[in-house]
């Protein structure tokens, strides 16, 4: 149906009407600024989450993104999180059966993970091991959330052991460290 107005105000009105808090910009390299301005104009600000990578300036209104990464041994630092510590990335690696890399990179970067089991009708269930790891990471991250927007975030903080990587998250008088073991074996000793 023709709403009688351009898409940005029509979408903003609809999102306000249904009480939505955001829009997933599937396949988009950034939700255009016009949508954010229209949402603000109707008094119903929205979180925009494009699938692709928006321009750096678009982080001002694309406050979330998907994180579709390669997972090298040394964890990559999420560019958008680095530029804007309040930016929330949701790691999406929908076809991978082992979610270890997703969870480690999310934990290292202080960002989220998208648990997507039914991918357009194709089942890619989460294993009991990954489900338990997800529960543990969420249990640690939820009470520490204020640290993960620290402008003093220091990714790739030096560590003593091979294959052990950390991010340092200072906030006031306290600091949180997120530490990941990228080895395929356990590591013990001072870090």
PLM features: residue spans?
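Short His-Asn-centered micro-motif
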Residues: 25-28, 49-51
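Structured segments of extracytoplasmic/periplasmic soluble domains
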Residues: 14-17, 26, 41, 109
């Amino acid at each position: 149906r023709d709403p009688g107005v351009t898409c940005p105000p029509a979408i903003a009105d609809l999102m306000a009407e249904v009480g939505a808090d955001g829009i997933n910009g599937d396949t988009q390299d950034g939700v255009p600024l016009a949508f954010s301005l229209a949402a603000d104009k109707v008094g119903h600000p929205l979180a925009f989450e494009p699938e692709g990578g928006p321009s750096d300036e678009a982080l001002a209104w694309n406050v979330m993104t998907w994180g579709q990464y390669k997972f090298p041994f040394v964890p990559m630092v999420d560019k958008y999180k680095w530029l804007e510590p309040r930016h929330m990335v949701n790691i999406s690696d929908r076809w991978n059966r082992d979610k270890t890399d997703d969870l480690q990179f999310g934990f290292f970067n202080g960002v989220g993970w998208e648990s997507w089991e039914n991918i357009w009708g194709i089942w890619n269930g989460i294993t009991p091991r990954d489900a338990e790891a997800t529960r543990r990471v969420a249990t640690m991250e939820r009470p520490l959330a204020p640290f993960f927007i620290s402008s003093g975030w220091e990714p790739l903080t030096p560590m003593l052991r091979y294959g052990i990587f950390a991010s340092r998250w200072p906030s006031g008088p306290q600091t949180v460290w997120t530490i990941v073991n990228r080895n395929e074996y356990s590591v013990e000793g001072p870090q």
